[in-house]
């Protein structure tokens, strides 16, 4: 399984110019596809007054301006059309595992970068929380190229492998406190930890939440290596895995399928939109297809 070593891989900062170009279609799909409705109904804001016209709602009359001008004026409001995006990214030890060529975290990092550049292209504010066994980094949503570079610089940093565990539940709760307006939230994780569902319920009651599960072929199939020692990266539990055993292979494959089904059911039950992406897939292709759909469920 892969570790978190990025040797030989260009950083997101180094790839910024190319990513800006490749995410234009993704940005358009985000703005016009599944989440188009989120650009509407974010609230209304006062934009000025104009003279009353026949048919206007009399409840909109601005009586102060009308009194000063001796002509009836009505208040004009405009709908906010700004979509705010927030990324909750898992950097725990289990995210350092993956395929031979790419870890789960490297896949998550690419997904986060693509969404960040799509947000920049649409002038959408974007922020993030990074976590492992503790909250590592918090950035409130802002818009513009400088914000993009700040986020990418943190996505590029090597995860701290000294910190065990995962505080996804705390990250979800913290995001709910940070976000002051309805937002599109992406939770990017392998979701191996427990006790995150209650926090998802609360977050999804105020925001639109997409749960992005980073999978890997090793979730279902392991190479035949005989009996090998295995240490769970999250809890440190050690066990022997007989990878040549047919019964073990069958059990491993079925457990992987059941975990995926439980996660999918849990997301839907608690208000999240499930999206699975494998370390072997192209994140841009998967995200473009996801955003271009008129319905996500």
Which positions does each model-derived feature cover?
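Exposed, interaction-prone extracellular/peripheral surfaces
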Residues: 1-32, 38, 51-56, 65, ...
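A positional/architectural concept
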Residues: 39-43
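Acidic, metal-associated active-site segment
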Residues: 48
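N-terminal juxtadomain amphipathic helix
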Residues: 58-60
């Amino acid at each position: 399984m892969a570790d978190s070593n990025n040797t030989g891989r260009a950083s997101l900062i180094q790839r910024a110019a190319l990513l800006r170009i490749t995410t234009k279609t993704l940005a358009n799909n985000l703005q016009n596809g599944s989440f188009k409705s989120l650009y509407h109904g974010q609230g209304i804001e006062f934009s000025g007054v104009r003279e009353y016209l026949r048919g206007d709602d009399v409840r909109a009359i601005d009586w102060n301006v009308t009194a000063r001008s001796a002509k009836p004026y009505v208040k004009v409001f405009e709908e906010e059309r700004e979509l705010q995006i927030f990324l909750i990214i898992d950097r725990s030890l289990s995210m350092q595992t993956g395929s031979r060529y790419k870890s789960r975290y490297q896949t998550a990092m690419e997904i986060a970068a693509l969404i960040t550049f799509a947000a920049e292209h649409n002038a959408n504010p974007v922020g993030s929380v990074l976590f492992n066994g503790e909250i590592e980094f918090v950035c409130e949503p802002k818009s513009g190229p400088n914000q993009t570079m700040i986020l990418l610089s943190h996505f590029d940093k090597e995860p701290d492998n000294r910190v065990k565990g995962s505080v996804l539940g705390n990250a979800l709760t913290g995001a709910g406190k940070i976000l002051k307006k309805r937002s599109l939230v992406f939770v990017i994780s392998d979701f191996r930890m427990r006790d995150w569902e209650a926090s998802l319920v609360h977050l999804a009651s105020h925001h639109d939440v997409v749960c992005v599960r980073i999978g890997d072929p090793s979730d279902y199939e392991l190479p035949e290596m005989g009996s090998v020692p295995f240490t769970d990266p999250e809890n440190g539990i050690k066990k022997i895995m007989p990878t040549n055993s047919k019964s073990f292979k069958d059990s491993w494959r079925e457990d992987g399928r059941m975990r995926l089904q439980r996660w999918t059911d849990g997301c839907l039950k608690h208000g999240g939109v499930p999206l699975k992406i494998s370390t072997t897939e192209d994140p841009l292709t998967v995200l473009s297809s996801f955003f271009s759909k008129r319905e996500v469920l």
